[in-house]
């Protein structure tokens, strides 16, 4: 927790931080984050673990691409010139998402080198539910419009179960800590920029704050929770797989999103045939699957789902 900091660095960043507090970096925060960040200004005094500290640096860590886990970085000093780093990850109390734009790169940063195994173990654990899903929608069904053909399923991390294709991630306590803290982040996100200076491990959070009603810096300090403690009390992380569909009447799909499970469409004996692929999580994206599907639809003279019938459908997963 305690670190040694060269006084020159602290003095050198002071003016820079004052400029940044009112600048464009603040625009990256949501309203609640911005308000909380505004409480943690240079010179603010607070008590922590029975000692009084004064903030000598406070800002949002940034990097060239993506985001660190730390939302608010605080460097503070006590009367013995001992410095302490507090690195807060802020989460809204009612937020369901932990990660909603999962890519292979992001998965590795969350789960480490075994990320593919982690995701495949999770999706195959509910393989029977995937087998029950409709793939071709000749008619509107529940929330899926007529004309949709499924390309695969995106992968999201949640605080709770969400939908039919959802379940608890198979993770150790240490892996859950890694997800919340960002221990597996790439170097540019771990060693993020704070007030214009690269600070080692500034992007790796050590506290989590889930209370947006705080009104003072002391309340922030009092209500933040060590990530290890938070994980002990909330050890579950859930995943949800959300369908990416090709809308045949519009000839569109919602972007080139990485897919945790893909539908490998092909043509066999004059019929459009699907096969679900679980062992290439997030390595195949929506564009590739859509282009393959469209190629076989063209070969079979299928323009939209109105053209699909018993003669050219190689699956009964049609509604």
Question: Positions of the model-derived regions?
Answer:
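N-terminal amphipathic/basic-hydrophobic helices that include classical n-h-c signal peptides
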Residues: 1-25
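A short, highly charged nucleic-acid-interacting micro-segment common to nuclease
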Residues: 21-42, 62-65
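Catalytic cores of nucleic-acid endonucleases
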Residues: 27, 44, 48, 81-284
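A short acidic/basic microdomain associated with nuclease active sites
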Residues: 42-78
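Charge-dense, extended regions
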Residues: 258-319
């Amino acid at each position: 927790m305690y670190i040694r900091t060269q006084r020159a660095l602290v003095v050198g960043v002071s003016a820079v931080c004052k400029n940044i507090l009112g600048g464009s970096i603040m625009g990256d925060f949501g309203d609640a984050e911005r308000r909380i960040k505004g409480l943690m200004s240079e010179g603010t005094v607070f008590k922590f673990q029975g000692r009084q500290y004064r903030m000598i640096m406070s800002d949002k860590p940034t990097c060239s691409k993506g985001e660190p886990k730390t939302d608010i970085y605080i460097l503070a000093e006590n009367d013995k010139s001992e410095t302490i780093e507090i690195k807060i990850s802020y989460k809204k109390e009612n937020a369901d998402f932990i990660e909603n734009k999962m890519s292979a790169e992001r998965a590795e940063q969350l789960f480490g080198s075994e990320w593919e195994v982690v995701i495949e173990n999770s999706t195959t654990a509910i393989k029977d539910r995937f087998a029950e899903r409709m793939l071709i929608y000749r008619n509107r069904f529940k929330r899926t419009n007529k004309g949709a053909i499924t390309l695969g399923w995106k992968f999201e991390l949640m605080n709770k179960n969400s939908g039919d294709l959802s379940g608890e991630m198979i993770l150790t306590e240490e892996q859950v800590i890694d997800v919340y803290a960002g221990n597996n982040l790439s170097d540019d996100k771990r060693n993020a920029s704070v007030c214009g200076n690269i600070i080692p491990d500034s992007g790796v959070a050590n506290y989590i704050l889930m209370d947006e009603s705080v009104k003072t810096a002391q309340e922030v300090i009092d209500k933040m929770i060590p990530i290890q403690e938070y994980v002990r009390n909330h050890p579950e992380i859930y995943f949800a797989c959300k369908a990416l569909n090709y809308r045949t009447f519009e000839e569109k799909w919602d972007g080139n999103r990485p897919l945790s499970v893909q539908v490998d469409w092909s043509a066999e004996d004059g019929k459009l045939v699907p096969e679900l692929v679980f062992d290439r999580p997030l390595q195949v994206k929506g564009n590739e699957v859509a282009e393959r599907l469209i190629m076989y639809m063209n070969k079979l003279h299928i323009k939209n789902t109105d053209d699909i019938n018993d003669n050219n459908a190689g699956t009964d997963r049609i509604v």
